[in-house]
Amino acid sequence: MAFKIASSPHVSTTLHTNTVMKRVALCLIPGIAVQSYYFGYGTLVQLLLAITVAYLAEAAVMKLRNRNITATLTDNSALVTASLLAVAIPPLAPWWLIVIGTLFAIVIVKQLYGGLGNNVFNPAMAAYVLLLISFPVQMTSWVAPQTLTVNYADMLHTFNSIFQLNAGYAADFFHLAIDGTTMATPLDTLKTDLSMGLTTTESMTKTIFSGSVGEGWFWVNMAYLVGGLVMLKLKVIRWHISGAIVLTLFVCASIGFLISPDTFVSPIMHLFSGGTMLAAFFIATDPVTAATSPRGRLIFGAMIGLLIYLIRTFGGYPDAVAFAVLLANMCAPFIDYYVRPRSYGHRVGN
């Protein structure tokens, strides 16, 4: 009986790049929907702007490099990068902010290093840090959840604010005019109050903490968690990085909270506020910029979880997701070098 002999690789998969990226984008939909419900149409407008600029920028770069434009645009990587950046910035941020960030992510961070698969840093997070450092006022001007706002940001007001069509419609028109709290996220509010000598208990009596974590933010994180679990089910990502981030952050926050609950934020607050779940399942799991081996992924994820806690607790930025991811990206090659699997035929020693 004759057997067919074929060269390697002998294991094939139907999960091509465009399929993986498409599934990631689809799994973002629950989080985007809940975020839009609580924070208005601005998220959708930012998303549309980011995707448009990302595709135009990628097409322009491919044209300059004499590469296949269609093949690059259809891998859907620009779609994911644009989506992650769009949901990370304030919904009513001016239009030029998302344009600058998207151009930086696609042209500088991604294509300047050679395109998909060659970038060292996560493009969306690198762009986020650039915007945060360069335009701190615009990047920290979050609107309050619509369930608490005095003025509802309908589509007309949203367009006026983002595109600055009318000076009377600025982001501060939609602030939360209760208890002196303005456009601050729960993490921002806690960070500011703790620096002023208030306890966490005193700070969480404010209206923005009408829920156990913060109005709206708990459900936004839950929605991204659901999307992340779907990706695990579809085997788009593996559990190591996400699990290590969540577990490490929970353990570190629990230790601090047990030591001094009046000065350290609770573990539930850390897990379900800010961009924790978005980072754990959609950002840190980027296969290009993360560690590759199972042990390496665990170390990589634990490092991100630890950095998120340390920067949130002792650093100058309330939500440390972007900084933690970029620092871990820098260490990914180092991690891979020291935890790489032993090759077959490797001699242990005498």
Curated annotation (Swiss-Prot):
Disulfide bonds: none annotated. Part of a membrane-bound complex that couples electron transfer with translocation of ions across the membrane. It comes from the Bacteria. This is Ion-translocating oxidoreductase complex subunit D. InterPro entries: NqrB/RnfD, RnfD_bac. The complex is composed of six subunits: RnfA, RnfB, RnfC, RnfD, RnfE and RnfG. The keyword Transport applies. Its cofactor is FMN. The chain crosses the membrane at residues 37-57, 78-109, 124-144, 158-178, 212-232, 239-259, 264-284, 298-318, 319-339. It is a multi-pass membrane protein. Keywords: Cell inner membrane, Cell membrane, Electron transport, Flavoprotein, FMN, Membrane, Phosphoprotein, Translocase, Transmembrane, Transmembrane helix, Transport. It comes from Shewanella frigidimarina (strain NCIMB 400). One of its GO terms (cellular component) is plasma membrane. The lineage of its organism: Bacteria, Pseudomonadati, Pseudomonadota, Gammaproteobacteria, Alteromonadales. The keyword Plastid does not apply. Its EC number is 7.-.-.-. It is an enzyme of class 7 (translocase). Belongs to the NqrB/RnfD family. One of its GO terms (biological process) is transmembrane transport. It is found in: Cell inner membrane. The modification FMN phosphoryl threonine is found at residue 185.
